[in-house]
């Protein structure tokens, strides 16, 4: 048993003597040095980005704060536009309702050119009967006169433009 241990120890000694540790460790050291150099470059780049970002933030925040009045005006204009869009939507609904009533009064169901021109004329000729007129549920006429739908005025929401003021003078 003692001889086996000595044989094994000699074999291991030969392996250790034949192994060139410097040859195996040098590539690892080189890789570690490369990684440290890259890490240093990254740290420098990160510091540069931080400094630039801080400078930009300081300059831009001051500029943005300088536009506060303009932002308030823009906000007021956007609010006016939203109100205008709401009123336009309501006006459009009223105009559509008025058109529907007019189509009912003229008995228009055919939207071709022929239908739009001839059908109302035929309906007027055949509608001389008063019972037909009394059966119509709604009308755009007040005292036999057409009443147009009142629509919005953009000046109410945006004011007159400088161009319109110049033309008015």
From Swiss-Prot:
Q: Name one GO biological process term.
A: eye pigment granule organization
Gene that encodes it: Blos4
This protein's name: Biogenesis of lysosome-related organelles complex 1 subunit 4
Q: Which family does it belong to?
A: Belongs to the BLOC1S4 family.
UniProt-listed InterPro entries: Cappuccino (IPR024857)
The protein's role, per its UniProt record: Component of the biogenesis of lysosome-related organelles complex-1 (BLOC-1) involved in pigment granule biogenesis.
Which GO CC terms are listed, alphabetically?
A: BLOC-1 complex
What quaternary structure, including any partners, is listed in this protein's UniProt entry? Answer: Component of the biogenesis of lysosome-related organelles complex-1 (BLOC-1) composed of Blos1, Blos2, Blos3, Blos4, Dysb, Muted, Pldn and Snapin. Interacts with Pldn.
Instruction: Give the originating organism.
Output: Drosophila melanogaster (Fruit fly)
